[in-house]
């Protein structure tokens, strides 16, 4: 042993006086040689216990303590349960080659399971490690270790891995298709029967805005509430406005398409041969003379004779 090797060395390495150089004036110091301890193999548990008892008695205060402070009470050693002695005996038994668990009366986990759990229950308390392993897998998304996999396989009665703590797992992100919701699914919706819709359409065709009295009568007749009848009329008017707006847009689009398809008409240019000369207007005297056949230039007299316009000389 290393300890015995140091003890068996020559004591000459610890001289009685310290050698010093001539330049330093140091007083000689005497060292006492260490006692010769027996070999380490000679120790026994009983000897170790006796040495510990002697050390405790040496450290315990005697009557030399002053009365002003009083002897300290070792209550901290008495605060432990009586099981401490059993633990010390178990340690001693383990040093001698035995098992400390056997000396203290503990049994193996298999014996404990055989004595205390003779029947197999489906809801076994040992499912807690599976829950803990599932929680650790949730917090740490890395690959599970072989120990956790083995524990999960042993806890499953059918041999398949099954996690008993599904409610502790983080829910997976749903797909985009499941996240899309329509407007009517999130709200309260009334499904009208064919007879109710027919009567409501008749009333809407008669009057787009229903009166309070007619609304109460129609609700009592169809088995609906007045609020439901009012909401149906509001939705029906909105639907009609939407339909009319769509029709107007379609008409405008058709007109635009027709204008783009047919080019605008171009003005026709006159041809040079088609132009004709316009006759000049005639005077009334010339027209009158031309209308009388064989007329002689002159003026008719009162007796019906013709007067010569020329003056005779």
Curated annotation (Swiss-Prot):
This is Homeobox protein CDX-2. PROSITE patterns: HOMEOBOX_1 (PS00027), HOMEOBOX_2 (PS50071). Transcription factor which regulates the transcription of multiple genes expressed in the intestinal epithelium. Binds to the promoter of the intestinal sucrase-isomaltase SI and activates SI transcription. Binds to the DNA sequence 5'-ATAAAAACTTAT-3' in the promoter region of VDR and activates VDR transcription. Binds to and activates transcription of LPH. Activates transcription of CLDN2 and intestinal mucin MUC2. Binds to the 5'-AATTTTTTACAACACCT-3' DNA sequence in the promoter region of CA1 and activates CA1 transcription. The keyword Phosphoprotein applies. Residues 114-124 have a biased composition (Basic residues). GO terms for molecular function: DNA-binding transcription factor activity; DNA-binding transcription repressor activity, RNA polymerase II-specific; methyl-CpG binding; RNA polymerase II cis-regulatory region sequence-specific DNA binding. Coiled coil: none annotated. One of its GO terms (cellular component) is nucleoplasm. Residues 185-244 bind DNA. It is found in: Nucleus. Residues 249-261, 271-300 have a biased composition (Low complexity). Keywords: Activator, Developmental protein, DNA-binding, Homeobox, Nucleus, Phosphoprotein, Transcription, Transcription regulation, Ubl conjugation. Belongs to the Caudal homeobox family. PANTHER family: HOMEOBOX PROTEIN CDX, HOMEOBOX PROTEIN CDX-2. It comes from the Eukaryota. Ubiquitinated, leading to its degradation by the proteasome. Residues 227-241 are annotated as: Interaction with 5-mCpG DNA. Gene3D superfamilies: Homeodomain-like. Expressed in the intestine. Can bind DNA as a monomer or homodimer. SUPFAM superfamilies: Homeodomain-like. The modification Phosphoserine is found at residues 60, 283. GO terms for biological process: animal organ morphogenesis; anterior/posterior axis specification; blood vessel development; endosome to lysosome transport; establishment or maintenance of epithelial cell apical/basal polarity; intestinal epithelial cell differentiation; labyrinthine layer development; positive regulation of cell differentiation. A motif (4S motif) lies at residues 283-295. Its main location: nucleus. Residues 185-215 are annotated as: Interaction with DNA.
């Amino acid at each position: 042993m290393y300890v015995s090797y140091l003890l068996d060395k020559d004591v000459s390495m610890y001289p009685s006086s310290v050698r010093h150089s001539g330049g330093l004036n140091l007083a000689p110091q005497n060292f006492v040689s260490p006692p010769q301890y027996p070999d380490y193999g000679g120790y026994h548990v009983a000897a170790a216990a006796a040495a510990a008892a002697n050390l405790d008695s040496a450290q315990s205060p005697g009557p030399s303590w002053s009365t002003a402070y009083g002897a300290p009470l070792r209550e901290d050693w008495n605060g432990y349960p009586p099981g401490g002695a059993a633990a010390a005996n178990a340690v001693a038994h383990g040093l001698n080659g035995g098992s400390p668990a056997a000396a203290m009366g503990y049994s193996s986990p298999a014996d404990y399971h055989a004595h205390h759990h003779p029947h197999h229950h489906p809801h076994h308390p040992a499912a807690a490690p599976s829950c803990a392993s599932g929680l650790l897998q949730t917090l740490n998304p890395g690959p599970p270790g072989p120990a956790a996999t083995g524990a999960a396989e042993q806890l499953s009665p059918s041999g398949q891995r099954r996690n008993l703590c599904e409610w502790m797992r983080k829910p997976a992100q749903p797909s985009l298709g499941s996240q899309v919701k329509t407007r009517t699914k999130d709200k309260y919706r009334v499904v009208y029967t064919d007879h109710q819709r027919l009567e409501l359409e008749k009333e809407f065709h008669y009057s787009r805005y229903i009166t309070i009295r007619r609304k109460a009568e129609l609700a009592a007749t169809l088995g609906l509430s007045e609020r439901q009848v009012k909401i149906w009329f509001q939705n029906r008017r909105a639907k009609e406005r939407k339909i009319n707006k769509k029709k107007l847009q379609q008409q405008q689009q058709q007109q635009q398409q027709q204008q783009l398809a047919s080019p605008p008409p171009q003005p026709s240019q006159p041809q040079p041969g088609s132009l004709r000369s316009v006759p000049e207007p005639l005077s009334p005297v010339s027209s009158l003379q031309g209308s009388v056949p064989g007329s002689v230039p002159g003026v008719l007299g009162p007796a019906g004779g013709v007067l010569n316009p020329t003056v005779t000389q």
